[in-house]
Regions:
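Short Pro/Gly-enriched beta-strand edge/turn motifs at strand-loop
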Residues: 60-66, 152, 334-342
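Histidine-centered catalytic/metal-binding microenvironments
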Residues: 432-490
Length: 490
């Protein structure tokens, strides 16, 4: 999916949490209704078959309960997207990435091949299943991962065994670490730990720009990779580091150069998004003019950076809702020209389906540590709401999305608000901002108050109280969302 991701290490976040956030965007001309769901062990398949690639995978018998944000309309797969399991391991999948012709030749993607002819007749060729894709990954990995590193290993093993039919980036988190995995061709992959004091910005482009093969093949302190990556790179001459001998890659190399792309479309669709996110979080750098450190079309914008100050939930929401505010590229702005205002793909667009921010708080007890902040619809007009993840059910307002358009659930109410406010952006702006600030403030107070309330409860009683708190807060959000819908309608 055409998404945008930001990852924030624990020492770079405002409260010591690991933070994983990603927009899921629908493709042009298509909208996929979304809902919240808790998947229980008895609901997890033991034999899984992908709808798109027809791949069948046998799964372990010991899945954990986990949260997810699946598609509503049946027929093309689950697309669980983001969530936490019972051990407070988070996963967000996927960020669709780009690659290049050398990689596709060296390790072709594993596409589904339909059957030819009729079974039982001469010349019949049976269908060949494809590999894994975004449709599958959360369902196949999150119920079994015991840590962020373990999630990387599980998915890495699946990729090496079954392959993939698309290029993807996947985030895993626990209370101590965030790992980012990028698929390389059909069966190869690399993963890097997000530095604790840094954030990572990811548009739809292969991002990791420095990788230590020795660490990945040894201690794996900060890097992991597919088993034969070094030999495969050497065979296909994929490392582009100057001065490296032709028979092998450098111990430390740049994967973005080796495996990624620098196409003209990247400079419209991808690099501008990374440029603007980092502009917001490191504003003292030079971002404009002939002496700019980076421009919207720079190919060397860093994968990770230390921010100028600690990053908040609101910072994440702002950058993942952004449309180049304050620049000549703002599609809602008055600076520049019509050409500049339409030059680059914004992050906050009408095709945003959902935004999940996965927060793991080290100061909270494990029973209520995981908070999944959620927003639906266009991020320029919606608000994040917090949900405790250690629960058996989700509030109906978030979970009961149907294909039918209605104002009675959070997804469609936000879609309606976005459609109405988009064409009257400036007239509706004040009402939208008031709603976002009020709901955000309500959310932070809710978490503070419920943390205190459940801290004195026996652990066995905590999930039920968290579910009750989620439900009560959802009703308050419903009131505020209905009020905003009325304001933008009039």
């Amino acid at each position: 999916m055409p998404c945008t991701t930001i990852l924030v290490g624990k020492n770079a976040s405002y409260d010591g949490s690991t933070l994983v956030a990603r927009n899921e965007d629908s493709s042009n001309g298509v909208f996929e209704p979304k809902r919240m769901r808790v998947v229980h062990p008895d609901e997890q398949p033991r034999v899984y078959t992908s709808v798109l690639s027809h791949l069948t995978v046998e799964l372990p018998d010991n899945p954990m309960r986990y949260t997810s944000v699946p598609d509503v309309v049946p027929g093309h797969g689950i697309w669980a997207e983001a969530g936490f399991n019972e051990l407070n391991v988070g996963m967000s999948a996927t960020e669709t990435l780009t690659t290049n012709e050398r990689v596709r030749g060296a390790d072709p993607l594993v596409d589904y091949v339909p059957a030819k002819g009729n079974e039982g007749e001469d010349g019949y060729v049976p269908a060949q299943p494809g590999g894994l894709g975004e449709e599958d990954m959360v369902t196949l990995v999150l119920p079994y991962a015991k840590s962020a590193r373990d999630g990387v290993r599980i998915l890495g093993d699946l990729l090496e065994r079954y392959g993939t039919y698309e290029n993807n980036g996947i985030a895993f988190s626990d209370v101590d670490e965030i790992w980012w995995l990028e698929t390389i061709g059909g069966h190869h992959w690399i993963a890097k730990r997000v530095p604790d004091d840094a954030y990572v910005t990811m548009p739809n482009q292969l991002g990791i720009d420095s990788f230590d093969l020795d660490d990945a093949e040894g201690a794996q302190a900060d890097h992991m990779c597919s088993a034969d990556l070094r030999a495969w790179m050497a065979e296909w001459h994929l490392d582009l580091t100057l001065g490296v001998e032709g028979d092998g890659p450098a111990a430390v190399f740049n994967p973005r150069e080796a495996f990624g792309s620098h196409s003209d479309s990247d400079h419209v669709y991808n690099t501008p998004r990374a440029w603007y996110m980092q502009r917001c979080l490191n504003p003292s750098d030079v971002w404009d003019g002939p002496d700019a450190d980076y421009t919207p079309e720079s190919d060397d914008i860093p994968w990770s950076r230390v921010p100028e100050r600690k990053v908040t939930i609101e910072d994440i929401k702002y950058v993942l809702s952004s449309h180049y505010q304050g620049t000549e590229y703002d599609c809602y702005g008055s600076k520049g020209t019509p050409a500049t205002r339409g030059a680059y793909r914004p992050i906050g667009i009408n095709r945003n389906s959902q935004l999940a921010v996965l927060q793991l708080r080290p100061y909270a007890q494990p029973a209520y540590r995981a908070v999944q902040w959620m927003a639906f619809g266009s991020n320029s007009f919606n608000a994040l709401v917090p949900l405790y993840a250690n629960v058996e059910t989700m509030p109906e307002y978030y979970a009961d999305t149907q294909a039918r358009v209605t104002s009675e659930n959070f997804y469609w109410a936000n879609r309606l608000i976005g459609a109405l406010a988009d064409v009257r952006f400036h007239e509706c702006g004040r009402a939208v901002e008031d709603y976002q600030e009020k709901v955000g403030g309500m959310g932070h107070k809710q978490i503070h108050d419920i943390d205190a309330a459940v801290a004195v409860l026996p652990e066995a009683e905590v999930p039920a109280e968290l579910a009750r708190a989620n439900e009560e807060f959802a009703e308050r959000v419903r009131v505020e969302t209905d009020a905003l819908l009325g304001k933008v309608l009039y």
